[in-house]
Amino acid sequence: MVPLSWSILLGVALFVIGAGGVLLRRNILIVLMSLELLLNSVNINFIAFGQYYDDFRGQIFAIFVIAITAAEVAVALGILVALVRNKSTLKVDDVTIMKG
């Protein structure tokens, strides 16, 4: 069994990398991937604490987060495709208004 501290360290490392990507990058696609890293780090911590406390609720929360993330990605990619068709850019700074 993996010690809890290793799982927490992995979750924190992924969270820091994801937060850095969201805050520092200007490409919308990279920002979306960084958000996925943030959510996956939370999933790792949910599962690690669930295993540590011998409770299955951490896994259930992780499954809910994965389902919500899948819906979020579907909507975000739809908006991204519409944005590329209208503006021909993926930079966050170039997109200031969402009206067509």
From Swiss-Prot:
Function of the protein: NDH-1 shuttles electrons from NADH, via FMN and iron-sulfur (Fe-S) centers, to quinones in the respiratory chain. The immediate electron acceptor for the enzyme in this species is believed to be ubiquinone. Couples the redox reaction to proton translocation (for every two electrons transferred, four hydrogen ions are translocated across the cytoplasmic membrane), and thus conserves the redox energy in a proton gradient.
Gene Ontology molecular function, alphabetical: NADH:ubiquinone reductase (non-electrogenic) activity; quinone binding
Catalysis: reaction(s): a quinone + NADH + 5 H(+)(in) = a quinol + NAD(+) + 4 H(+)(out)
Annotated signal sequence range: none
Annotated localization: Cell inner membrane
Topology term for the membrane: Multi-pass membrane protein
Paired cysteines (S-S): none
Keyword field: Cell inner membrane, Cell membrane, Membrane, NAD, Plasmid, Quinone, Translocase, Transmembrane, Transmembrane helix, Transport, Ubiquinone
Annotated EC: 7.1.1.-
Keyword check for Membrane: yes
Family indicated by similarity: Belongs to the complex I subunit 4L family.
GO terms of biological process kind: ATP synthesis coupled electron transport
Stated name of the protein: NADH-quinone oxidoreductase subunit K 2
Top class in the EC scheme: translocase
Membrane-spanning ranges: 4-24, 28-48, 60-80
GO cellular component entries: NADH dehydrogenase complex; plasma membrane
Name of the gene encoding the protein in the UniProt record: nuoK2
Subunit composition and interactions: NDH-1 is composed of 14 different subunits. Subunits NuoA, H, J, K, L, M, N constitute the membrane sector of the complex.
Pfam families, per the entry: Oxidored_q2
